[in-house]
């Protein structure tokens, strides 16, 4: 199970797709997961919040993001036990980072995660990009009017970055955290990830 983390515009989805190609080329079976899952009822609510259609408090948001992942827990475990390689574009680490930045208690968030007992990733790659780069990429990708309320908030994204760094430095939930400079060339980033995984 490989988890890709980072703020908006870090390049997680790009790396997830490149990684999938390389795994499949190496003859591995792959399952892809991405959160929030906008195809789920929980993901739909999250999307409505992000585009300011509904209002949710920080506790509602924390548990909504979490339930969106918990719904897949059984399927994830089945995939792992069947020998599939899981590539996850954001996991509960992002929920902790984003909702702690929004005011949810950081220590409490970590305690709740431990109680839920979601799968432990083999590797967590934190793709680190400056907030300015994140915002530029998102505006270019979506257009200035289509960025969501998190993607357009510089002060908020800076706080999220700090919580990501905290999680990485604490080695929360797994010893296998790796930080990668997300401003590098896309292929170079992918090569670094693949080398770190020891994909044969």
Where do the protein language model's features map onto the residues?
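Walker A (P-loop) ATP-phosphate-binding motif of ABC ATPase nucleotide-binding domains
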Residues: 1
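NTP-dependent small-molecule kinase module
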Residues: 20, 132-200
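Conserved lysine of the Walker
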Residues: 12
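P-loop (Walker A) phosphate-binding loop of NTP-binding proteins
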Residues: 7
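Hydrophobic positions on the alpha1 helix immediately C-terminal to the Walker A/P-loop
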Residues: 15
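ATP-dependent small-molecule kinase phosphotransfer cores
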Residues: 28-111
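A glycine- and Lys/Arg-enriched "phosphate-lid" helix/loop adjacent to the NTP-binding pocket
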Residues: 95-162
